[in-house]
Structure formats: C-alpha cells, structure tokens
Amino acid sequence: MHNGHRKQAARDWVKKGQKGRPQTGGVRENMKSLQARYLDRLAELYPTIAAASTEIINLESILNLPKGTEHFLTDIHGEYEAFSHVLKNGSGSVKRKIDDVFGNTLSRQDKQSLATLIYYPAEKMSRILQTEKNPDDWYKITLYRLIAVCRRAASKYTRSKIRKALPKEFAYVLEELLTERGDLQDKESYYDAIVQTIVRVGRAKAFIIALSELIQRLTVDHLHIVGDIYDRGPGPHIIMDKMMTYHSIDVQWGNHDVLWMGAAAGQMGCIANAIRICARYGNLDILEDGYGINLLPLATFAINTYGDDPCTCFQLKGSDSYSASEREMNQKMHKAISIIQFKAEGQIIKRHPEFGLEKRNLLHHIDFERGVLEMDGREYKMLDMNFPTVDPKDPYAFTPEEADIMERLERAFMNCEKLQQHMKFLLAKGSLYKVYNNNLLYHGCVPLNEDGTFKEVEIYGKKYKGKALYDILDNYVRKGFVAVDKVEREKGRDMMWYIWLNENSPLFGKDKMATFERYFLAEKETHKEIKNPYYNMLENEEVLDRILREFGLEPEGAHIINGHVPVKSKDGESPLKCGGKLLVIDGGFSRAYQKETGIAGYTLIYNSYGLILAAHDPFESTEAAIEKESDIHSESRMVKWVPERKCVGDTDIGRELKEKIKDLEKLLNAYYSGAIAEKFTR
C-alpha cells in the first residue's frame, strides 16, 4: 500500500469512530494463541528440556560448519555428454579436492587417473584391470586414495548429513572408514583390516564405484541450472532424467524450457516450435525415441505434400549423421511443421490481440502471384513459394490434414508419461528466478526502458514491471498445468507461448523472433533481432543495484547470475560485468556456439572461500575422457575471495536454523517457567 493510501485509510478509520475500530486486543490474543499452539507442536517434537537443549546444541554446531559448495550451470542445450561430465567433475572441484589431499605426493598423471576413476569408476576400472598385473594391490592403493579424498569432501558436513548420503549397501563400513576414531590405539591396523576384507571377499569393485559416486555427491552440495536444458542438442530427455536423481537442485526456466512446458501442456504454437527445432537440428529422435511421440502422421503428410519439393530453405543444421534419404525426409518434415507453426501462431495472435504481435503475422503479406513479401513498407523476394497448404484468402487456416496432425500431436504430448514427469519436475524445482545466498539467478533479462527503469508490461489487462512481472508470468505458467478453471488454464498455456517469443518476455528480450525471415528472405538486415536495453546496461551499477533491490537484495556484496547470452571470449569479452556484480555464465555447451565464442562456455562455483569462475574448453567425448583421461580443460579464477571462510550460519539455510534456535529457546523458557510441562519418558 502506498503511503498516501495508508494515510487515507487512517483518516477513514478515525471518521468511523469507535464502532468501526478493529479489535486489536482480539488480534493480539489470536497471535498469542497461535504462538502457544506452535510451542505445543514443538513440544511434541522435543518433549523434554534435554531434547530441546540437545537440538539447540546440534543446530549451533551446524552453523559453524563451512558453507556447502554451490555449482551453477546454464544453457546446456541438450548436450548431455558434456553436461554429465561437468556434473561429475564439479567444474574442477573434484581435482581441487585431490590436490588438497595429495599435494606433490602424487604425480600429475596419477592425479589425473584418480580423477577419471572418480568420474567414470566402472568404465575406467575395467580398462585398468585389463593390464594390471597385481589387481589386489591396485584395489588397496586405490581404496586408500579414494577414502582420503572422500574424507576431505565430507569434512564440511555433519555426520548425520553424510550418513544420509551413504549408499545403503556399504553405509556402516563407509561410516567407519570416513570417521576419525580417536579411541583406537592402532587406527592404521583397524582401517587396513577393513580394506583387506573388502578386497578378500570380492567387493572391491563395487566399493570403489560407491566411493567414487559418494565423492561426486559430497563435492557439490547444491546445483543451480540457470535455464535452457532444451534446444538444439540431442539429449535433453537424458539430462532431465539425470537432474531428477540429483540430491539437491533448483532450476531457473529458460525460454526453451518454457517452450517445452507449453508443448507438454498442449499449446499448439509451442508444440509446432518444439518439433520444428528438433527437425532443424536433426534431433527428431528426441521426440520419437526419447519421448515415444509418434511422428509418422507428420512424415506421411510431408511426403505427400512436398514430395517433389527439394525444401532447400529447410536444410538441417549441425548434423552429419543422416543418410541422403533421411536428410531429404527430415527436410520435408521440417518444412511441413514450419508452415503449420506459422499458421498456429497466426491463430494465437488473432485470439490475443493484447499480445501486440500482429506484425509477426506475415503469411497474409505475401503476394502469391509475384512471389514477394510486403513488410515495413518494402518488398522482399521470397526464397520459396511452394505453399500448397496455404490459402491466400485464409492463410492461417489449417487444412483438414494439418488439423488432424496437430490434434494427434496435442494428445501425444499431453499423454506422454515421461514428458509429463519431466515437466512436473521443472514445475516443482523451477521458477523464473531464484534468490539464493545473496545471489539473484535468472535466464534472459529484466525488461527495461531506454533510461534503465523497469518496463511496464500489460498481461491480460493489468500492468506489471520488475519482480511483479516475473511473478505474474511464473503464476500463469503454473496455471497452464493446474488451473481448475478452463479459461485460466488456456490463458496459462498461451502465456507460455508468449514467454517464448514476445519482446516483453524476460526470457526472450528481443524486438522480434525472426524465424520466418531467416527461412524465406535473403536480406540479412531482416534477420536482425534488436535486444532489450537491459543488454546495454550490464556495466551500469545504478541499474544493477536497482534490479537487486527490486528482488529484495542489498546491492553491497550481492550478485546477479545470468544465463542466455553467449560470451564471445575470443573477441576479448568478459563474463564479469560491472566489476563482478553481474556474471554472464552461458554454459556454451552447444557446439554451434563454440565457434562464435571461442570456448565451451563458463560455469560457476560458490564455495566457502568465495566465487570461482571456470572457463571450459570443448568436451571431446565420454570415450575420450575415459580412454585418454582427457578431462575438460578449465581455467579457473577467483571472482570474489572472502577474508573469513563462509559458514552455514552466513547462508539462507543458516538464517532458517537461527530462527529455529530462537523458537527452541522460547520452548526452553516455557519449560523452565512451567508454562509447558515436560513429557514423562521412561
């Protein structure tokens, strides 16, 4: 409520007199009652002074542990092999643990072999054992080394947290090996006996795998995915499967993620776009094999409709694995779904004039007799004029065959169990932005005016800007899946398409999506997409501070972590903007961008010592990583070093624990004052 409104409300309250006054005493009594009920509930969990006191001691000890390591990845674009490898090596975090433990006591080659074993234990072990003359000795040496690294990785966690991370099969033995036993006079003999037994009973292989996976898990405490799991790469579904098993994760949706969410919700514009992008990059296997979506009706329609059409405007990008016949088939499907997409989008634009996208409807601006497009007062020669399914009098209407295909695809997307599970995960773990440990995470941009103020955007008749715009769009994405009211659900579905390509969308942030122009017009100036002013203000501290405050952060010491835009390192561009206040960490996993950027992108580590930015060389392959031990070469640099090591007490979780300690201290006071009686326990 604005200050003026508050004053007016106060004046109105005075005019009403005593009769209209709120019963503040009743409110206070209700608050007291609520607090009493809360303490009663807390007393059920901690029924004695001893139990409450012990929990306070435990929580206080956690507050003083080193902060867990956060790992930030973005713009994975379906490149599952590179993603999986970076996840395994923690952007160099595993190697740092190995260096911490062994220093100069192991050769560089031995350290690299140990790191590769931790990343790919089963595969690497099978290769080593093929040539190893004394496997039992190798098992023992390797187990001792892995135990040492695992102890280091576990050192910042409570015993309780480590216990929860242990694989059930080896939980007891691992706990013994990882825990320092001060009560034993001959610890070496004790540990050696355990290791000898593991080897003697034939469980060394399984134990090495379990230890390696535990090191991976303990090295990174929490994973942030700052958008775009989906796009042009071949395995977004594999990445989603991997993410769903990760121990602690959040996702900030990217534009491609929301596109697939819209497709899963049955939004036809999103469905057509998702299929078109798969076709464009030769990844229709994602749909057919990954999600079991039947594309045969589309393929049959494409052959029948474009049988003699070479479809030269719809050639594949970035895929050399197709035969000539497969490539021809793919191009015809690519054209068929593209024309369907332009029609579907035309229907959405007509349905929602408030989206302000009328200028993106271009089919009715084609002069079919002359083969030209009239746009922005100019005429452009069309590169392709074979449109047998487009009626010049009603260009956005589906033919009966197209309508049937889209109805089938809509059912297929909405009834695909695996796709729906993936989208439920994105809804549960994801959002348009995240504020976490004094960092603001989002994909794309905060829509701004030319003067750096927040741009006001109309969404279904109401205006929003800044954080409020993010919140309402996030809300409509969820409505698109769960709203009971059919009208609201339909609005939510269409809003996902809006988020995908509207200039006012935080996830797009360009004046247009020039898909049509890129296919059909040779003039490069028509392909240009002008970015939101946000992208020109990444070095403007005043603007960045305004954004941080808008999302509830004090600018001093806070950071914005931003995905979406590839950083052109080869041209000298830095991912650090405004003295490190904003970090652009497009992961660069997509091979298509690597020629443009010069590297394979950036990832970020935030541990108890500060922020570490890792710049990666391209990933060759999983096979090369195992056989040649060719880890992704990464150059790491400290972006922000903290003079005092950060503890759990300095984090968001720490603040929650401090609140819990306060509540427990109130419970203790209630016990000591006699307001609540201790429970009798035998």
Where are the model-predicted features located?
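Feature recognizes metal-dependent phosphohydrolase scaffolds
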Residues: 2-7, 11-21, 25-682
